[in-house]
Regions:
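Conserved N-terminal helical subregion
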Residues: 2-4, 74-183, 191-196, 252
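N-terminal Rossmann-like FAD-binding beta1-loop-alpha1 element of flavoenzymes
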Residues: 6-33
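Conserved Rossmann-like nucleotide-cofactor binding loop
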Residues: 16, 39, 177
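Glycine-rich FAD pyrophosphate-binding loop
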Residues: 25-50
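N-terminal FAD cofactor-binding segment of flavoenzymes
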Residues: 46-88
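Conserved FAD/dinucleotide-binding core of flavoprotein oxidoreductases
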Residues: 97-100, 217-292
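Central beta-strand plus flanking loop segment that forms part of the substrate or channel wall
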Residues: 177-213, 220-222, 250-252, 268-272
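FAD-binding beta-loop-beta segment adjacent to the flavin cofactor pocket
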Residues: 288-302
């Protein structure tokens, strides 16, 4: 592959950019995937504590691209979903919505999971493994696009390393604050929800049995997503775990994040409830301000 004259250049090696580059490469398109960070850093345990819910159709795509074999042992099926509400006093309602996977048959008519929960680090590692094996994809990282020149036939990318690439099409997968969107003159509407999502892993006494739960509390949604039991090499052998996305008003979330472990544990357990027995957070706490960026358009010259 002439890596300097490409069919596609993808800027940004996150989940979306990596998946796009792999799909293009597997379709026979000469592709470059560029990111300013070393790719190994994306799979470090401390990089990102989030998980991803993979829907049934997305799982079929991962399987078709050869990614799923590396994920199957790390993916926890979602068999049921329960959604409940709480009043302004924070007390949970005794009523809830229940979605059962047995009522959502797959194409062959047999019950199938409603989705799978996978840690982002394992998802990135599986994508990187397949990308490294795809001869039509060149991984360029760490490196950075410092200038672009575009015309109706192609785009030229000038990299910080001094390298120059020409591609028939460029895709920006840099995220909501991507520099290429701004360079292309594509405006965006943005606003903050004045909320913060606290992300962590919790261990609990009883198994979750593949049930994903979400409580709509006064401060925001509190999601409990089923994870695989802990692995021996992580010091969590056999421990029942859930991924937590705990949304609160920004001011309250900041105060919660500053609490000492015993007080944080008490606030967390009060929201989680006792349906899985004693529960406690394990490992780091991550936090993400919540907002929305909506681009005015999603295409431009090349």
């Amino acid at each position: 592959m002439d890596s300097d004259r490409l069919d596609l250049a993808v800027v940004g090696a996150g989940l979306n950019g990596s998946l796009l580059a792999l799909a293009a490469g597997e379709a026979g398109l000469s592709t470059a995937l560029i990111d300013r960070m070393p790719l190994k850093s994306f799979t470090d345990a401390g990089f990102d504590g989030r998980t991803t819910a993979i829907a049934y159709t997305s799982q079929r795509l991962f399987a078709a691209l050869g990614v799923w074999p590396d994920l199957a042992d790390q993916a926890e099926p979602i068999l049921d979903i329960r959604i409940s509400d709480a009043g302004h006093d924070g007390r949970p309602s005794p009523l809830f919505l229940h979605f059962d996977h047995r009522e959502a048959a797959a194409e062959d008519g047999e019950p199938a999971p409603m989705g799978w929960i996978v840690e982002n680090r394992f998802l990135r590692a599986a994508l990187q493994h397949r990308l490294a094996a795809c001869k039509q994809v060149e991984l360029i990282a760490p490196d950075e696009v410092i200038e672009t020149r575009r015309d109706p036939d192609r785009a030229e990318l000038f990299l910080k390393s001094g390298r120059r690439l020409a591609a028939r099409l460029v895709a920006s997968a840099e995220g909501r604050l991507g520099a290429m969107r701004e360079e292309a003159g594509i405006g965006a509407r943005a606003w903050s929800y004045d909320q913060i999502a606290i992300v962590l892993v919790a261990r609990h006494e009883r198994p979750h049995r593949g049930v994903a739960q979400e409580k709509f509390l006064p401060g925001g949604p509190f999601a409990m997503l089923p994870m695989r039991d802990g692995a021996p090499h992580e010091g969590l052998a056999g421990e029942h775990r859930s991924s937590i996305v705990w949304t609160e008003r920004a001011d309250l979330a900041r105060r919660l994040l500053e609490l000492e472990p015993p007080r944080f544990q008490a606030e967390f357990a009060r929201r989680f409830g006792d349906h899985l027995g004693p529960v406690e957070p394990v490992g780091p706490r991550w936090w993400f301000p919540l907002g929305l960026v909506h681009a005015e358009r999603y295409i431009d010259t090349r």
